[in-house]
UniProtKB/Swiss-Prot annotation:
The keyword Secreted applies. Belongs to the bradykinin-potentiating peptide family. Keywords: Hypotensive agent, Metalloenzyme inhibitor, Metalloprotease inhibitor, Protease inhibitor, Pyrrolidone carboxylic acid, Secreted, Toxin. This is Bradykinin-potentiating peptide AP. Its main location: secreted. The modification Pyrrolidone carboxylic acid is found at Q1. It is found in: Secreted. It comes from the Eukaryota.
Length: 13
């Protein structure tokens, strides 16, 4: 089953 797209992950500092 295809998973729903996840929100973009912000770059770590």
């Amino acid at each position: 089953q295809a998973r729903p797209p996840h929100p973009p992950i912000p770059p770590a500092p």
